[in-house]
Amino acid sequence: MRLIIAEKHSVGQAIAQALGGHAERHDGYIEVGDDLVTWAQGHLVDLAAPDEYQGHDWGRWSLDTLPIDPTPDWQWKVGREKGARTGSTRSSRGLMRRDDTDSLVNACDPDREGEAIFRRIVAHAGVSQADATPCGSRALEEDAIRAAFESMR
């Protein structure tokens, strides 16, 4: 199955509708044929705060601890903003780990922020980003969405 990750709920719904066919709605995603469509809610995943890293004294600000560089052990966590701790996080993570999920599509906005949102969600789930395909469409019209997905094949 192909997992499509959109940046917002409204975009996920528009994609599911454009894909056509019978759509089954679940908590945090829509299944349409061989496609699973899920969505973020803005910045679902952010870097952990310095004081959340074990083995470092980064909790108190001090010149002695600068620069703070967690490389290579970046830690990701679900964001604190309202609504971030919902089914979207659980479902996108679970959907990426399903045995029948064989490809990822980045349907977030084709800009820096959209790319960051997508990559952070995938990193938080602990799956490979190597085979992710960008959708590259900002439009919400069915014809434009269909054309974008057809050009990926």
Task: Tell where the protein language model's regions lie, with residue ranges.
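Intrinsically disordered, low-complexity regulatory segments
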Residues: 1-153
